[in-house]
Amino acid sequence: MKQLLDFIPLILFFITYKLGGVREAAIVLVVATILQIVILKWKYGTVEKQQKIMASAVVFFGLLTAYFNEIRYLQWKVTIINGLFAIVLLIAQFQFKTPLIKKLLGKELQLPEKAWNTLNFGWAIFFIICMLVNIYISHNMSEEAWVDFKSFGIIGMTVIATIISGVYIYRYLPKDGSNSKDGEK
């Protein structure tokens, strides 16, 4: 249910953009995002920090987009958020020697430190790629092409990155079905 709720504002944004325009789509995105947070709080009693940050960014940049009737503000959001994710992952790994991916998934997975570092770095690179592709598309293609990319391209890229991560993680999983921590390679 939570994952489905994450896509509803994006789907509504896409449909509204195709039927109306950027201002209407931005307003629908902001309202749907606020409702999403309210529903999550009501149904689950809490909203994750990352979701609050993302919702705040959507509301801020969505309102700017609606007010000025200019999509570039939502385009900036994608660039800024992906850039921030990459920076946070890289600073945590190289400055603080703590791969954040391990903090997120470490309770579910037992991996060697090298694997956590590789995953963390890989996701940082992924966010940099998303940021750069977003910049390229927003500056060199039509507004409609950017909306299509935002609605489907980033999701496709995320699915591919997740599959690559899964394949990478698989090599470190225990082969006998046990949950031991001695799967070092």
Swiss-Prot record:
> Is Transmembrane among the key words of this record?
yes
Pfam families attached to this UniProt entry: IspA
The UniProt keyword set, sorted, is: Cell inner membrane, Cell membrane, Membrane, Transmembrane, Transmembrane helix
Question: What sections of the protein cross the membrane?
Answer: 19-39, 53-73, 76-96, 118-138, 149-169
The record describes its membrane topology as: Multi-pass membrane protein
Where, subcellularly, is it found?
Cell inner membrane
**Disulfide partners:** none
Instruction: Look up the record and report any one GO term of the cellular component aspect.
Output: plasma membrane
Q: Which NCBIfam families match?
A: ispZ (TIGR00997), PRK00259.1-2 (NF001324)
Kindly give the HAMAP family that the UniProt entry links to this protein: YciB
What's this chain's function?
A: Plays a role in cell envelope biogenesis, maintenance of cell envelope integrity and membrane homeostasis.
Instruction: Say which family it is in.
Output: Belongs to the YciB family.
Task: List the protein's name.
Answer: Inner membrane-spanning protein YciB
User: What phylogenetic lineage does the species belong to?
Assistant: Bacteria, Pseudomonadati, Pseudomonadota, Gammaproteobacteria, Pasteurellales
